């Protein structure tokens, strides 16, 4: 199960995070990719990293396989599980910049400084389902990418690449991002405000406790439920001033 969100503080600093819940460890650890680090791509020309990046993932024969990361320009990316919907290219596509799925996060972090640059580059990109090795296989993912101004979601399916503006700065797992956005309409009656007492004929009805502000917001671990809850909390959580308070906000 994966859920990711991002937000900025009162002075424009980006906070970007996700959970990564597996039933077994992969040996993941903190990875640091220095600026100028040589990257040997599967289909693109080898090139040094234009940006330094730090994130979580595994290293395979000196190659950083980021699950999520952020670079020195303030651009961040995370891959979240998306089985049953994603469909990468089986082979490189002529006339396209072909990026192997396992390379996608580090390719983003190594080469771009903002969402606008990423969107321009993605207009000519094909994502190829080539695994880094036969032992590791290919992860079935979609991605949230963010800078301090906005975020996007990238999904690669049978009909090609989809790049969505992400107005709620949230992502979970399958189904598609467009489904998750549409599903939020089920919760529009929850506005984060404490309800006033109601009168039904002679009965005076007051809310039962402070949790009434979340009435109707799902609390289970199903992907659409996690997306709905995370998007709601992200939108209604009070703004904070300090770094420690905003880190706590991310974990909450």
Question: Which ranges hold each PLM region?
Answer:
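A contiguous strand-loop segment
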Residues: 1-96, 129
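C-terminus-biased signal that marks the final domain/tail of proteins
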Residues: 1-15, 130-131, 138-139, 148, ...
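Short acidic-glycine loop/turn motifs at beta-strand connectors
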Residues: 8-11, 71-73, 146-150, 155-160, ...
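N-terminal short leaders/motifs
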Residues: 13-26, 94-108, 225-236
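A short, surface-exposed interaction/processing loop segment used at functional sites
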Residues: 23-43, 161-191
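Peripheral peptide segments
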Residues: 69, 82-83, 90-92, 121, ...
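Proteins synthesized as precursors that undergo proteolytic processing into mature forms
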Residues: 95-131, 243-252
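Aromatic- and glycine-enriched pocket-lining scaffold segments that form the walls
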Residues: 115, 119-156
